[in-house]
Amino acid sequence: MHKLSTLVPFFISVGLAQAAPSAQNYKWDSVKIGGGGGFVPGMILQRIVFNTKEKGLAYARTDIGGIYKLNSDDSWTPLTDFADNQRWNYWGADALATDPVEPKRVYVAAGMYTNSWDPNNGQILRSSDYGKTWSVTKLPFKRLAIDPNNNAILYFGARSGNGLWKSTDYGVTFTKVSSFTNTGSFIVDPSDSSGYNSDKMGIAWVTFDSTASKVGGATSRIFVGVANSGSNSVFVSNDAGSTWTAVAGQPTTYLPHKGVFSPSEKVLYVSYSDGSGPYDGAKGAVWKYSIANSKWTDITPATGSDLYFGFGGLTVDLQKPGTLMVAALNSWYPDAQIFRSRDSGATWSKLWEYNSSGGVNRYFGWDTSLAPWLNPPGNTDTKHAGWMIEGLSINPFDSNHWLYGTGATIYGGHDLTKWDTSARNITLKSLADGVEETAVLALISPTSGANLLSGVGDIGGFVHSNFKTSPRAAYTNPHYVTTPDMDYAGKKPATIVRIGNDGSDASIKQIALSTDAGATWAPYAPTPGGLAGGKIAVSATGETILWRNSNGVTVSRNSGAFTSVSGLSSNSAIASDKVNGTVFYAADGNKFYVSTNFGSSFSATSASLGSSSSPVKIASNTNKAGDVWVSTDKGLFHSTNYGASFTAAKSVTQAWAIGLGAPKTSGGAAAVFAVATIDGVTGYFRSDDEGNTWVQINDAAHGFGAVSSNPISGDPRVYGRVYVGTNGRGIFSGDIA
């Protein structure tokens, strides 16, 4: 975890970026998957935030995909696409606050991890123009709230035992609140050597009592929830943060996930769970604390055997005092559960409930028209309402409008008060249009069929026949939760292979084969059980599959059994020649290997990949046999003779993903797309002359996050077109402007 250091303000404008050696304007668009595709929850945090002063203003924050702003048509606009390789952790939005006094101001606590996975400290992003541009204050470490009576004051609750911090200048600088000494003791797994689960959760939330008196212009009463289990976890200051005490009489069994203040009632509502979220939760409670009589009341909406979850997302209806909602964390079967009360928690109604015959009465319709893959044909999953619900909000100006985040999308609707009628027939809609929070692992652009197919984390992947509409369904037969790699046969492009990453069920073959361009699939029968992941390559003529997995490199020809390939390590990069069906390639260290017998055996060529120790990607030309490129940690290398000799691309000192696309002129050199460092600039580049000259194609508004995570593919049918996959912002298509 990061040690505390001096707090230094550090400013970055979205419009500033290091100039590339040369640049070409590109038009970038999202390839629509729709529905979000990722977690919009909250660990112990709120993830969908409405502004209480400006009607219709709301933001959503995601764990790996940055920040979005709500539009009037229910769609969302991304606000942090500028994040580049140096600022990739800006996409980890750990907290968000929208100013209740000056709505144009918005603040984000950004950072990915507190262990070694993210070597950077956190930062506060601050905007005074609704997120169009940002300035940055670097933090020594990461929960964020704005004083409703003095909006220059911000409080920030940190992780890792770093305590409570305060700003009095709109977030430009922060100082530690030394009087707040309880920084949270809960650790998910102290034995986790990676540091991911062995860090202190820290401060969970900060909530102001907007009805309290002022001290020096600041709100006097402030509540802070801390990740303590078995001891006091809710603390209060009655003197604008000068001193703090534990709120007397509070429950101490569980962790406080959300703290929401209802001004009209002068009541603090708190949701609790026995786990930190977002996946866990087996017990929990909901309590309220009355300012008037300093009394805590247990208002948990489930008891006994009906209580098999904790509680996460929590919201109040500011238009209807006493109306609140809370989400189960987690009810995995048959569906997520949400509770609603109109009498301050005295009684509750449910989103669904069991009937006398053991079936389920659902009091909602399910509309996934904006993301039909959430409910594909033949869907038998009982989970319609979602899972992992940490972010739950009712629009403060509209009692019918509500939103909540799940592990896959944002749900909500515009008829919430129908819940309170005898019919209870609300419509639950996927309302995440514009949110593209997928982690993309593989992209291919075959020479025929759909221009793009994707391999995606958590939701499998898709055939993208239309970039403007959401796919009807993810891959099936089999459906893999995550697709780490794909390939197509260069001479028979309708033949496509993909792999899954979970070999725990040996009966599910982790290679799938399509012979109709991804329209239908079948498990590849020779695939051995228990193996998964790695990299995959299919021969140009489609009859041979080369698979690198944890057992090394194996090959199957004509649907025969997989056999080991000698001479290659399980670290080898692999690929097929896209024209010559007998040839496969491999690279390991600074050596390049070629097979001319359908992958049965490989021999190292005499050519060297310079001082490379880690080849990343091999890409072969769809139009020329033996024309192959290799990206490495020490540069980019090109061969036109099956790897017998290589030429190092000029000025390229490191390269990650590469892809080849249609040539500028018919019969000319393939366009080469590279995620690389060229002349000291790290970015996204294209060369039309075999790497002799380059143009940078990404710009200050499109950074695409961490370069090491992102696959790239040129389009062999459209000159200049490139597809970029990101780790949290989905897929982008780029064309010359």
Each model region followed by its residue ranges:
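Extracellular glycan-interacting surfaces
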Residues: F11-V14, Q18-A737
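Classical eukaryotic N-terminal signal peptides for Sec-dependent ER targeting/secretion
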Residues: M1-P9
